[in-house]
């Protein structure tokens, strides 16, 4: 009886261990982010690797400044001089970050952008908004117009810095669209990937001690979150918005943008983003399915010469698919569609069909091209042979008929 009980206990423990391991693996792969909204998109493919509440409206806090910076870069030169107005620095509530700047101070657009995007200086945002849009209201109109152009459908901006306003909101997906657009601008990338920048001395401040340090610790070499593959881009925090972070990372052939809106703490926005990054690189890879020029299919062409009748169809472009590592390349089956009639003559490179791969929810398409020329078959020889055969047969028939023809009987004479 004791032996039987022991065996039962061992069996139960064994099953429990297996179940525990299974639950752990599932939890690791089923990513859930501790934030109000989160999103991971691989830029090159457009693959949505993860999303939670990505189309739910949230307050953006200082990630707003991404849009402010890109509008400034598109409407100004970095060397332009801007004068700081009284209104630009007098409308900032206490507790919000400032450079600081001084009334009447003349600064370059470049320095103001570094103050805006590294230290997250709210005074710099107002100064740039007045310079570019004529007023904060005018600049806000520009922001909303630009957001609409980029495809943002659930956003509305009323200021250039994200200082809380109930009518100032966005979504994780809309911020992805804005961030993706901004990261195509080399000047923008240079700024947001910089760890620190010293503002130049000015007419109102002669010292060179205003050091703007990036609030994004992923680009801080002394931070435990430092990652050399991260290219920026922006943090944001208000009481109402929570902790926000948009990050761009390039690694293993991936260009990934992650968005977190409303993380619980300042540190968790980084730790959760790091977990999101690890999830991508631990679970996804680029699979090279085909190289341009690979032979996909061999066909027989109608009305072609014997020498060129057999034709290889080659793929028009490389196909590299982002897919879950659980999916093997050899398991991916293509959908091939050829023209209804493929008849000679055919020119090398002529499109004869299409090929489509569906991998982990994404479609990858390419054309199928003729690898070489196909010559149309001529029928002169065949006709001559046919005529010759016909004449021979006709001659044989005539000869046979002559041989079997009965001689005419002579009439009897009486």
What are these regions, as identified by a protein language model?
Residues 19-20, 78, 203, 291:
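Residues in and immediately flanking transmembrane alpha helices
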Residues 2-27, 384-402:
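Sec-dependent N-terminal signal peptides of Gram-positive bacterial secreted proteins and lipoproteins
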Residues 25-186, 190:
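Active-site-adjacent loops and short helices of periplasmic peptidoglycan-processing enzymes
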């Amino acid at each position: 009886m004791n032996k039987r009980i022991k065996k039962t206990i061992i069996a139960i423990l064994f099953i429990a261990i297996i179940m525990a391991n299974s639950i752990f693996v599932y939890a690791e792969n089923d990513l859930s982010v501790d934030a109000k909204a989160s999103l991971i998109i691989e830029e090159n493919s457009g693959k949505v690797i993860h999303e939670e509440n990505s189309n739910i409206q949230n307050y953006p806090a200082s990630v707003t400044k991404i849009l402010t910076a890109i509008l400034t870069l598109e409407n100004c030169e970095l060397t332009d001089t801007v004068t700081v107005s009284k209104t630009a620095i007098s409308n900032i509530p206490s507790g919000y970050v400032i450079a600081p700047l001084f009334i009447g101070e003349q600064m370059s657009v470049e320095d103001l952008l570094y103050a805006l995007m590294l230290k997250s200086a709210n005074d710099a945002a107002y100064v740039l908004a007045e310079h570019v849009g004529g007023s904060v209201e005018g600049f806000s109109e520009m922001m909303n117009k630009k957001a609409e152009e980029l495809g943002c459908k659930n956003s509305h901006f009323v200021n250039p810095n994200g200082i809380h306003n109930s009518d100032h909101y966005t979504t994780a997906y809309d911020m992805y669209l804005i961030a993706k657009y901004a990261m195509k601008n080399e000047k923008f990338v240079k700024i947001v990937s910089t760890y620190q920048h010293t503002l130049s001395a000015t007419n109102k401040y002669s010292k060179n001690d205003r050091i703007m340090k990036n609030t994004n610790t992923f680009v801080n070499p002394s931070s435990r979150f430092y990652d050399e593959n991260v290219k920026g881009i922006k943090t944001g925090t208000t009481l109402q918005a929570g902790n926000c972070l948009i990050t761009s990372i390039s690694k293993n052939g991936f260009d990934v943008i992650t968005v977190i809106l409303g993380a619980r703490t300042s540190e968790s926005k980084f730790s959760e983003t790091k977990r999101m990054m690890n999830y991508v690189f631990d679970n996804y890879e680029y699979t090279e399915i085909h190289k341009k020029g690979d032979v996909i299919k061999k066909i027989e062409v109608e009305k072609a010469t014997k020498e060129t009748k057999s034709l290889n169809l080659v793929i028009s472009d490389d196909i590299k698919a982002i897919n879950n590592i659980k999916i093997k390349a050899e398991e991916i089956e293509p959908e091939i569609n050829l023209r209804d009639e493929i008849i000679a003559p055919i020119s090398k490179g002529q499109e004869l069909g299409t090929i489509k791969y569906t991998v982990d929810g994404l479609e990858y398409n390419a054309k199928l091209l003729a690898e070489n020329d196909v010559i149309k078959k001529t029928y002169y020889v065949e006709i001559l042979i046919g005529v010759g055969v016909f004449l021979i047969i006709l001659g044989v028939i005539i000869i046979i008929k002559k041989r079997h023809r009965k001689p005419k009987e002579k009439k009897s004479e009486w």
